[in-house]
């Protein structure tokens, strides 16, 4: 789990650097007192500060506004975001090589360089206060971070170039820095190999019995979770014999003959990659450190909501910090509520259609060429009555103290599975905030449809808001954002 340790990375290193590089006039230092590169490794404190700096390039999934740092929601088929951010240019195809939104390749290679420097020097630390156990821990956490930086780039750019232990000189010219990309399979094998080494190291902890002071470190489960996701990505059609990528090759170069002119994507489909992905996932399914979250009262709605509501619960493998819930809450709370509310992040209609009925059958099985949904009549969903309103009891009433929770809403939202009601908020329903509830309308002129902050699809995301608190009074609660969880 990755808690507030990452939020301390820059703070600790910046504070230490500030103390170590304070004005000479103020400290009246002698020339030989200046911190040199060699002196960093003489002190436990400065060695740790360098470690924190190397770790500070980890992605920030639970900070800033939704869509500010990552494109994965706004540019997806499952989510729609109102605000004008980089994902919009991706959705409209208006970006190009000169204007790449969310460009982070230089950031991650700088992070890789810092990890390499740290790993090559950490064992030079001569401070008796630095134990072998601490040095081992820092080394392997940095090695995990280096692998994760590669993984993050692969998520964004596909195949990238592997540099191993090389220290790139970012002051060099573009020509000197040029490296051809390794193939996709080479990248996968390298990252999987690095993460496997981390998972097998005695210095990388297991989750069970982990002290709270260690929350934030990558565990063995974290390593296997990244491996599982990467192998899943590698098995899917996008990276497994995709015809669109068969002509993508490295430029011909004499400087790197082994990669000159080679195809960087797999040329043929390999069904065995699905077996490898399944095996990687089973490692975590067999790990008794993690269990699917259960509220303990038999309520499936609370079981599902608790995954993102109960901090540090048993289903979470790795999280992004224990942080204030404001960012996720304020972007998903309807503008019809008092206090700060932006209400612009929600699921698309296709995502809403993907949820099953409470009998387990899926109502929408596909779409006609015209875009009209294909309905499974045996599911109980009626296309003729989907927009008709009727009064029915809202199933996820466990969030509230109200014994009777009846709403008048379209039948298309009636009798759906628990995950639907925990995730999807639709107009004509009450938004619960503490002991209060507010009826929300997304219709034109409604309290949830302002001129600029409103859900374009007519839906908001329900589950990342703490419905037990009243955001109108500035109460947002805290969140351990699930980067990897057992349920996936």
PLM regions and their residue ranges:
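Bacterial Sec-dependent N-terminal signal peptides
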Residues: 1-32
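Conserved, well-structured interaction surfaces
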Residues: 43-64, 83-158, 175-220, 391-394, ...
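Elongated scaffold/linker segments in the mid-to-C-terminal portions of large proteins
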Residues: 55, 62, 86-89, 93-103, ...
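Short, surface-exposed recognition loops and adjoining beta-strand edges that mediate ligand/DNA contacts
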Residues: 65-82, 163-166, 203-222, 238-346
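Short coil/turn linking the two alpha-helices of tandem helical-hairpin repeats
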Residues: 154-155, 161, 230-242
């Amino acid at each position: 789990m990755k808690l507030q340790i990452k939020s301390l990375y820059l703070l600790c290193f910046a504070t230490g650097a500030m103390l170590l590089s304070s004005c000479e006039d103020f400290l009246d230092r002698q020339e030989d007192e200046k911190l040199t590169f060699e002196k960093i490794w003489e002190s436990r404190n400065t060695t740790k500060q360098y470690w924190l700096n190397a770790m500070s390039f980890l992605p920030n999934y639970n900070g800033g506004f939704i869509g500010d740092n990552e494109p994965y929601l706004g540019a997806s088929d499952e989510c729609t975001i109102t605000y004008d951010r980089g994902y919009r240019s991706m959705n409209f195809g208006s970006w190009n090589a000169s204007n790449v939104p969310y460009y982070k390749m230089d950031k991650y290679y700088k992070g890789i360089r810092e990890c390499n420097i740290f790993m090559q020097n950490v064992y030079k630390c001569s401070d008796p206060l630095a134990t072998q156990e601490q040095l081992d821990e820092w080394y392997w956490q940095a090695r995990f971070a280096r692998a994760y930086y590669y993984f993050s780039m692969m998520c964004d750019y596909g195949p990238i170039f592997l540099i191993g232990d090389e220290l790139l000189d970012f002051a060099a010219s573009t020509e000197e820095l040029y490296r051809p990309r390794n193939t996709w399979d080479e990248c996968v094998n390298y990252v999987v190999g690095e993460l496997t080494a981390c998972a097998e190291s005695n210095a990388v902890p297991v989750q069970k019995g982990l002290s709270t002071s260690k929350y934030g470190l990558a565990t063995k489960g974290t390593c296997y979770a990244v491996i599982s996701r990467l192998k899943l990505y590698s098995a899917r059609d996008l990276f497994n014999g995709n015809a669109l990528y068969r002509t993508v090759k490295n430029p011909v170069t004499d400087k790197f003959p082994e990669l000159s002119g080679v195809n960087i994507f797999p040329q043929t489909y390999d069904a065995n990659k699905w077996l490898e992905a399944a095996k990687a996932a089973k490692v975590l399914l067999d790990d008794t450190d993690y269990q699917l979250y259960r509220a303990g009262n038999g309520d499936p709605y609370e079981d599902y909501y608790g995954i993102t509501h109960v901090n540090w619960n048993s289903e979470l493998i790795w999280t992004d910090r224990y942080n204030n819930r404001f960012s996720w809450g304020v972007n998903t709370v309807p503008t019809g509520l008092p206090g700060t509310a932006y209400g612009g992040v929600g699921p698309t209609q296709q995502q809403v259609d993907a949820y099953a009925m409470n009998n387990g059958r899926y109502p929408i099985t596909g779409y006609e060429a015209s875009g009209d949904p294909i309905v499974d009549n045996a599911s109980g969903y009626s296309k003729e009555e989907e927009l008709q309103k009727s009064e029915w009891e809202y199933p996820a009433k466990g969030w509230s103290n109200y014994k009777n929770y009846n709403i008048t809403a379209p039948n298309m939202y009636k009798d759906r599975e628990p995950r639907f009601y925990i995730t999807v908020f639709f107009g004509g329903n009450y938004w619960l905030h503490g002991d209060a509830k507010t009826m929300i309308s997304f219709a034109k002129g409604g309290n949830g449809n302002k001129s600029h902050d409103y859900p374009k699809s007519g839906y908001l995301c329900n589950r990342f808001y703490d419905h037990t608190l009243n955001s109108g009074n500035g109460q947002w609660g805290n969140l351990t954002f699930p980067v990897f969880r057992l349920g996936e």
